[in-house]
Amino acid sequence: MATIADSRDIILAPVISEKSYGLLDDNVYTFVVHPDSNKTQIKIAIEKIFSVKVASVNTSNRKGKCKRTRTGFGRRKNTKRAIVTLAPGSKSIDLFGTPA
């Protein structure tokens, strides 16, 4: 396994869906992460980037869907998601930014 140098290379993007949006009230956040990262690296990266205390990290590997194209079949890439639960009393993460 290769080491990942920067925390921002581990956390790729937040997942914005109905399910993940509903979990924001419980201080549970979902992120797309680098496929080679482990739970410890994800926890350290979240704590470093957002200055919060992480209680737990759950990960899931998602297979890419097969999609039909004009020339045959293609495939979306496989992704890894991390569901991060913040510790009680920790400040929340502002994913959407403040309104202008």
Curated annotation (Swiss-Prot):
Taxonomic path = Bacteria, Bacillati, Actinomycetota, Actinomycetes, Mycobacteriales
The record's similarity note reads: Belongs to the universal ribosomal protein uL23 family.
Offer an example of a GO molecular function term for this protein. rRNA binding
What organism is listed for this UniProt entry? Mycobacterium leprae (strain TN)
Q: What does this protein do?
A: One of the early assembly proteins it binds 23S rRNA. One of the proteins that surrounds the polypeptide exit tunnel on the outside of the ribosome. Forms the main docking site for trigger factor binding to the ribosome.
Name assigned to this protein: Large ribosomal subunit protein uL23
Q: Which GO terms describe its biological process?
A: translation
Show the Pfam families listed in the entry.
Answer: Ribosomal_L23
Which pairs of Cys residues are joined through disulfide bonds in the record? none
The source's domain of life comes to Bacteria
Report keywords, A-Z: Ribonucleoprotein, Ribosomal protein, RNA-binding, rRNA-binding
Q: Per its UniProt record, what InterPro entries does this chain match?
A: Nucleotide-bd_a/b_plait_sf, Ribosomal_uL23-like, Ribosomal_uL23/eL15/eS24_sf, Ribosomal_uL23_CS
Is Coiled coil set as a keyword in this record? Answer: no
HAMAP family, per the entry: Ribosomal_uL23_B
**Which residues span the membrane?**
none
Its cellular-component GO annotations read: ribonucleoprotein complex; ribosome
The record describes its quaternary structure and partners as: Part of the 50S ribosomal subunit. Contacts protein L29, and trigger factor when it is bound to the ribosome.
